[in-house]
């Protein structure tokens, strides 16, 4: 009888924790960042630090988020020439070994 009660208790605990894990959606662990508008002007390259491409299907538009040296995030249109040039230059800069 004690063995049966112990097994039942163990099953209840396993079922409780198992449903909590299963109930958590995948999207909870990965926040979604979207741009709802993009900058109209051009940001000088010397002010840019890094970038992230936004291509999530849940976002209203494709965009590039530039992180400035002043630690600000700025959304830009990836189709604009200055954005493409800045991305290329930032990629080159990140591949260049630092002394």
Swiss-Prot record:
Keywords: Chemotaxis, Cytokine, Disulfide bond, Heparin-binding, Inflammatory response, Pyrrolidone carboxylic acid, Secreted, Signal. Disulfide bonds join 34-59, 35-75. SMART domains: SCY (SM00199). InterPro entries: Chemokine_b/g/d (IPR039809), Chemokine_CC_CS (IPR000827), Chemokine_IL8-like_dom (IPR001811), Interleukin_8-like_sf (IPR036048). One of its GO terms (biological process) is cell-cell signaling. The keyword ATP-binding does not apply. Gene3D superfamilies: 2.40.50.40. It is found in: Secreted. GO terms for cellular component: extracellular space. One of its GO terms (molecular function) is chemokine activity. PROSITE patterns: SMALL_CYTOKINES_CC (PS00472). The keyword Ribosomal protein does not apply. The modification Pyrrolidone carboxylic acid is found at residue 24. Residues 1-23 form the signal peptide. Belongs to the intercrine beta (chemokine CC) family. Chemotactic factor that attracts monocytes. This protein can bind heparin. Monomer or homodimer; in equilibrium. This is C-C motif chemokine 8. The lineage of its organism: Eukaryota, Metazoa, Chordata, Craniata, Vertebrata. The gene is CCL8.
